[in-house]
Amino acid sequence: MKKLLAAGIIGLLTVSIASPSFAAEKQADTNVAVLFDGSGSMVQKTGGERKIDIAKKSVKSFAELLPKDTNLMLRVFGHAGNNKLSGKALSCSTTETIYGLHPYEGSLFDNSLSELKPTGWTPIAKALADTRKEFEAFDADGKNVVYLITDGEETCGGDPAAEIEKLRASNVDTIVNIIGFNFDVKGNEEMKQAAVAGGGEYISANSADEFEQAWEKEAQKFTE
């Protein structure tokens, strides 16, 4: 009996040493959330191509370049209602995770992106608040990075900088980066301040090439 007990203890110790705990695995996770502007202004063209199409291609390339074990989430905002007063309430109250927090799967990610059509207003603050809640519910330990893509300012009365500060102050350690697409000077300055509050950086892109290059550089940071 003593021999069997000793063998059992040794076996348990062997399993414990060979298999890292779930908590240890979770601590090593890298979680990336992309907040995607689907508001009506994204239908506008730059260099002959719609901003929404440029953004879709760039984000897809970014996702493909991430390390295979990176958890990726895609949340959209501005895609509900319409860009008139009749659709403002719905548009401003809706953000949606269209690709849940897990490693990149090409066809699933592509399908999620392909269905996105630029439609309504720009509830940036709500998108950030909903991301914080989702990260907290997921208990997202490890490295958490948020990328906010937008071509315009908050139009739903929210305060993006305040929501970024809440995200930073929560029990989820998160960095917020902002990629502004075709912003005016005033918008650039406001977004710079918001990115500083998020512990990240603000990247201004005024053309398709600049936007695509920005995402390539960001993807490289996860492999360095």
Curated annotation (Swiss-Prot):
CDD domains the record matches: vWA_ywmD_type (cd01456)
Residues in the signal sequence: 1-23
Keywords: Signal
Signal recorded as keyword: yes
Stretches of the chain forming a coiled coil according to its record: none
UniProt entry tagged with the keyword Signal: yes
SMART domains recorded: VWA (SM00327)
InterPro entries linked: VWF_A, vWFA_dom_sf
Domain VWFA: from-to ranges: 31-224
Family of the protein in this entry: To B.subtilis YwmC.
Protein name: Uncharacterized protein YwmD
Natural source organism: Bacillus subtilis (strain 168)
